[in-house]
């Protein structure tokens, strides 16, 4: 979205995130069935000449070295859906919770610190911290590590669960409906 707007190719970009985790949950696995939720969210990003309203920067990253932390072993192209895949619950999401927690806190904290340092921002410059809504403990630990107050941090995971790609636009909407953001 940022690239389309900055290049002048588009004035408005609609960003949508949607997930239906209920279709890949093993409801006997307490490590995942209470965490994930279904949801969809969207945001319109528009061009502006006001620097205070502009997207400052974007950071996207992934690391395949941690593929075993959260995954589905079957139901895709490597192990297509079959009676065996379904019987063995290979199409259900599996997660190594403690390892995922540690990596998420470390990575998100570091990414935010790098972005703030890059743009010479302090905690006081950040009015709202709206992270991916993975887990309340992760959000709380990252917020504390970064020095953000509870008032700065938007949390919706306790309401909707981890809706993955939908979590940030849903959290933005929640904050908007509360009058916290414009």
Describe the predicted segments one by one.
Residues 6-11, 19-21, 35, 88-98, ...:
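Generic detector of short, locally flexible boundary/turn motifs and exposed helical patches
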Residues 1-9, 105, 109, 127-182:
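Claisen-condensing/thiolase-fold acyl-transfer catalytic domains that form or cleave C-C bonds
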Residues 16, 36-40, 75, 133, ...:
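Short glycine-rich loop/turn motifs that provide flexible caps or phosphate-binding loops at active sites
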Residues 29-102, 106, 110:
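Condensing-enzyme catalytic core mediating Claisen C-C bond formation in acyl metabolism
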Residues 13-18, 100-103, 159-162:
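N-terminal start-of-chain detector that recognizes signal peptides
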Residues 75-127, 138-146, 171, 175, ...:
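Conserved active-site "lid/cap" helical segment
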Residues 1-66, 171-182:
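Conserved beta-strand-centric core segments of catalytic alpha/beta enzyme folds
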């Amino acid at each position: 979205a940022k690239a389309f707007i900055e290049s002048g190719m588009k004035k408005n970009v609609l960003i949508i995130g949607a997930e239906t985790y209920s279709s890949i949950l093993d409801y006997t696995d307490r490590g995942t069935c209470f965490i994930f939720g279904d949801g969809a969210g969207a945001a319109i990003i528009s061009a502006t000449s006001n620097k205070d309203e502009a997207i400052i920067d974007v950071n996207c990253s992934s690391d395949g070295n941690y593929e075993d932390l959260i995954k589905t072993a079957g139901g895709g192209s490597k192990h297509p859906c079959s009676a065996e895949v379904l019987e063995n619950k290979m199409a259900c999401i599996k997660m190594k919770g403690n390892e995922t927690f540690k990596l998420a806190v470390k990575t998100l904290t570091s990414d935010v610190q790098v972005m703030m340092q890059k743009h010479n921002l302090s905690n006081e410059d950040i009015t709202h911290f709206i992270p991916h809504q993975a887990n309340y403990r992760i959000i709380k630990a990252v917020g504390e590590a970064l020095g953000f107050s509870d008032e700065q941090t938007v949390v919706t995971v306790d309401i909707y669960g981890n809706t993955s790609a939908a979590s940030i636009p849903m959290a933005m909407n929640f904050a908007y409906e509360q009058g916290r953001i414009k």
